[in-house]
């Protein structure tokens, strides 16, 4: 197997295996295989640390280190650096929770009922919730008028959300980026929209405790919808800029947490109507083979595909394509950014055409329309 490039370094098969072993240990509290770490050098450990940063799972990987025998752990110098970064992740998670609860309280005090997508809504499912590296706050209002009302209340506080080309709205709350999404998911296939709306009515959002030291409640998608939304989210990033281990870990943790709460037949039928069955075989194969998710935790029983194609994509470009040279290049011109997005999708279209051809086609069509509109503008 070929080595994968990480910045200017090479992530070897040994380092990839070590990182996945540590992730599995943190997720399922299982002892890592000692033989994987017996020949690790200081340089190998540096590679694992760098890769865990780029995949935004460094705190979880550090947690996995605590289950290693002391004689197999990295040097004290590296361990101290890693623990310091873990502490920073925990601090940022606390800050995120404070900002989220403050925003939810503000919106609910004004009679609004936002739904928390991804983020802290998934972090609460983790064995160690504060170790999930947070990004921004994603909200959705099932009633469109409530989003408009939210913007009015925000404007009264001097906050003016910026409209994005994809229809979402972006602003900052207590220093944390917030995004209001017009839809539960960005599924591009127009013929699947009726199915999504039907599922949203059939499996309404639920009120759950946020946890993590607070008694607060938040609204999140139902278990059924949550897994479907994550499936689509991962697909879009896999055929676009890139997908990282954090999103895959989110999915694995969700599958394990929701075991017994999802009707297998209904989930498979919904996946079929959304044309996701072939993609699910690849995605579920990765979860079982690379993250050691017990197969009985999958939403339904199926014949799995090998997850190697997806794993290759993950190692190459990392979380949201942050390792990609295309993503790292800067430009002040929006059309150049659109060209890089189009080129990224074109270069990874083989994965999409093979496992989700309809969604890949309509995503490419939507991107092309967006570029034409920007040129006319």
What are these regions (language model features)?
Residues 2-135, 141-377:
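Conserved NTP-donor binding/palm subdomain of two-metal-ion nucleotidyltransferases/polymerases, i.e.
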